């Protein structure tokens, strides 16, 4: 327990849409100093985009993977229905999250939805391994958020919409 306390106490607070003061690699390197090799290995396996539950996954990661898998399935069904001009009612997230705005705004909205899911899971984890798992996932969300290049994305979006007209 002490090792988690000292590691977590020195981590900077993360805020959505604010560039983090620590990178994921810096976080994992610092965690290596405090965690056992087996525990550190579990932490390095955390992957925001992974939805397959593996044996040995901590309970919090299994829950997140189920959440992510259900979110993606519902989005795929919704997008498929839209292509066929059919109605589809989203049940896991507000429709406005994916309907309003350009593709970049929608992607940011979905990242924020994931962030909120992690925020809701966090109160039960103050100075434990679960907090570190959540922190790692949040760093991955921020990394993805700050890799978006708005001018390049807008150019590609306009190319795709022009060719489909």
Positions of the model-derived regions?
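Extended alpha-helical surfaces
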Residues: 1-165
């Amino acid at each position: 327990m002490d090792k988690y306390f000292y590691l977590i106490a020195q981590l900077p607070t993360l805020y959505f849409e604010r560039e983090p003061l620590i990178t994921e690699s810096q976080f994992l390197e610092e965690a290596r100093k405090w965690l056992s090799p087996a525990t550190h290995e579990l932490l390095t396996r955390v992957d925001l985009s992974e939805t397959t539950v593996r044996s040995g996954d901590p309970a919090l990661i299994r829950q997140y993977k189920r959440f992510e898998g259900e979110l993606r399935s519902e989005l795929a069904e919704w997008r498929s229905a839209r292509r066929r001009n059919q109605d589809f009612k989203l049940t896991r997230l507000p429709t406005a999250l994916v309907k309003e705005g350009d593709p970049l705004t929608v992607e940011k909205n979905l990242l924020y939805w994931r962030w909120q899911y992690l925020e809701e899971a966090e109160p039960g984890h103050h100075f434990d391994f679960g907090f570190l798992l959540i922190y790692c996932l949040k760093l991955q969300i921020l990394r993805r958020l700050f890799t978006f290049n708005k001018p390049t994305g807008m150019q590609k979006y306009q190319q795709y919409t022009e060719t489909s007209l």
